[in-house]
Amino acid sequence: MKAAEIREKFLKFFESKGHTIVRSSSLVPGNDPTLMFTNSGMVQFKDVFLGTDPRPYSRATTAQRSVRAGGKHNDLENVGYTARHHTFFEMLGNFSFGDYFKHDAIRFAWELLTTVYQLPKEKLWVTVYQEDDEAYDIWAKEVGVPTERIIRIGDNKGARYASDNFWTMGDTGPCGPCTEIFYDHGPDVWGGPPGSPEEDGDRYIEIWNLVFMQFNRDAQGNMTRLPKQSVDTGMGLERLAAVLQHVHSNYEIDLFQNLIKAAARVTEISDLTNNSLKVIADHIRACSFLIVDGVIPGNEGRGYVLRRIVRRAIRHGYKLGRKGSFFHKLVADLVAEMGAAYPELKEAEQRVTDVLRQEEERFFETIEHGMSILEAALADVEAKGGKVLDGELAFKLHDTYGFPLDLTADVCRERGMTVDEPAFDDAMARQREQARAAGKFKATQGLEYSGAKTTFHGYEEIAFDDAKVVALYVDGSAVNEVKAGQDAVVVLDHTPFYAESGGQVGDQGVLANAATRFAVADTLKVQADVVGHHGTLEQGTLKIGDVLRAEIDAHRRARTQRNHSATHLMHKALREVLGAHVQQKGSLVDAEKTRFDFAHNAPMTDDEIRRVEQIVNNEILANAPGIVRVMPYDEAVKGGAMALFGEKYGDEVRVLDLGFSRELCGGTHVHRTGDIGFFKIVVEGGVAAGIRRVEAITGDNAVRYVQELDARVNEAAAALKAQPSELTQRIAQVQDQVKSLEKELGALKSKLASSQGDELAQQATEIGGVYVLAATLDGADAKTLRETVDKLKDKLKSAAIVLAAVEGGKVSLIAGVTPDASKKVKAGELVNFVAQQVGGKGGGRPDMAQAGGTEPANLPGALAGVKGWVEERL
């Protein structure tokens, strides 16, 4: 039975039992920003189990795409060395949300395994939690499993309920016993039943885990029965397929065998048992589906985990002798295997291929040099009888050549060595500390404050009349007063000033009373809810307890708000035009522009930029109101609000509905989309691998930009004696004229070179049967120099020639040597001899080479030395 059929039978079986088939959720969890990847079937139902996400069904079944690489759950280092470890796997599961419980869960599992999949009953063993008499009795008395094949597992982790057969969601919350089903491969395979000293062998393999959410545990560890008891089960498709296909390794099942054959094809390897092929076959699944779900290779978070997996696969291809890109070619094979079950993979096939190809090409630029350094270092360690690679070297490979630590550790493991990871960590920590020290030091950084939080009025007001000074800082230290001319940070009890956060810059403005004026240049957070006003006291003396009028620069705030609101609309438009994989990676919103970094693997086309602009400007014309609501985080996310991974959100969040956009945002915004006025993208480019940057302007800035652009178009049209509407056609005509003139000029230069060649030939000096010539050809370009050298070689028959030209303070050099003389006089060495004297370098073939220089004053002397240099070699 093939893997695809096993998956289909599982889902159809539970559908026949009243379960709703629910599509696999994304590998990027949408309901838990703390979780790196979806690693089990229950992740998408977490809030359902907690009772905060009502669904129209009480029974569900899924085939969930899952990844275990990076973070707490990390199988990466074992992939390729064991029979059952994977970075990507499919978890088959059935779930009951307060519906059926132990009896039906156990009965369904037994029926599916023994009737649908027709596994021999005598091959199945089960475990239960030691205190779960109910589950034990169901297995023994209702299902009829012999008691000698039912094993009670007690508390084996040092505390009550700390057992392999007792599941918990966390330190508190839903928990309960579980029962696991094992398959016995028979006495020919070493290993003992679960709970025995030999349980780590391969004879008894766990295939299904049934979790019974029976209790709620409070902070004191007390257990109370849940009013609605639930079921969460998980069975790895790959493990089940291995059992049903009568093989002992997951890599021997049909799905993996097809991918392994494909990996062998693209790496040109015939030995299908090579472990590196297993690694590549496993990794193409994880990498492809992560990219499908919007993850892009990068240097942090999920992006870095993806990069590590890609580069590990590339390294194994390199180990097989593959020196060029190959990994991306497997995407089509993966689509053939899994595209029917997961149509999102087929839809994203080209994008996945492009992302992987770009990442491969980038790593192949450094892998060869890095591997040679690593191999030399390992050979040195072996020669000295050592077993540990220096962590500093591992860090150099990471920092300079892009080798993730686990890739280096992988190579060491193959040699029976390890990496000094503490030394690696120390080197990494030093680099981070240096980066922090070199970074911008904010005026509020490190300020000690223990007072009350600042009340923010800036959403509604641009000024606050009775703001009291509660803290003052000069040069990072708390003071009681500030004198005129001093730079300081002022903390108020109330303020309309927005502190820099979420990409939006802090407000500027004035704090003043009758005797005092403090100019605020920037507003920053001292603590999460404490606002620091950084600036200069222009007049008077400022003391703690003084009462001031705090007033922001309203014009600057309005322009900043327009840009911030436009950013929300642009983010949504980018996802509509480019795809749902677009995720914000950084932003800067100020009064002049909005700068937005996002995950995307290719430059935007002109048409895509125009479409984004059109969508945003249509939303502006619609003049929709901005609606702000404060609500629980979970409710906001369930309502479709976009949350950014890595951002820290409290229990209560601020949700902004603006036109067709809905995001979590604490920034300041326009009241209606029409207030933005006009939106224009002015810059699009790349800032890192897989990260694009767009800069856009709004309102009067955008109008001014278009007016200036229009003026330049009119100037260009006037210069070309054309109407603006005819500009493209007129430019094409001028380009044709330029090409024609360049062609004529080239012909004239060639003719000149021919005539000069005849004259130069007469200047050649014969040395040992070889004519030597070193001369300057005024006005010649590189092409003319080459043609002249070729003609001189034909004319002189046996020659060593150097010709030079000077233009704009730069020297161009061409050297040519006829075949009979090139064994003793190499053109590359000859041109380098001259180039080094004129401040340059160069090289090429033995018969023809070129170079450049920046010191034309030295050229006459350099050319004069050619004759002697050649004579020494003949």
Curated annotation (Swiss-Prot):
Tree of life domain? Bacteria
> Which source organism does the UniProt entry give?
Burkholderia ambifaria (strain ATCC BAA-244 / DSM 16087 / CCUG 44356 / LMG 19182 / AMMD)
* Cellular component annotations (GO), alphabetically ordered: cytosol
The record's remark on the cofactor is: Binds 1 zinc ion per subunit.
Listed under catalytic activity are: tRNA(Ala) + L-alanine + ATP = L-alanyl-tRNA(Ala) + AMP + diphosphate
Name the enzyme group at the top EC level: ligase
This one is known as Alanine--tRNA ligase
What does this protein do, in the record's words? Answer: Catalyzes the attachment of alanine to tRNA(Ala) in a two-step reaction: alanine is first activated by ATP to form Ala-AMP and then transferred to the acceptor end of tRNA(Ala). Also edits incorrectly charged Ser-tRNA(Ala) and Gly-tRNA(Ala) via its editing domain.
> In Gene Ontology terms, what is a biological process of this protein?
alanyl-tRNA aminoacylation
The UniProt similarity line reads:
Belongs to the class-II aminoacyl-tRNA synthetase family.
Q: Where, subcellularly, is it found?
A: Cytoplasm
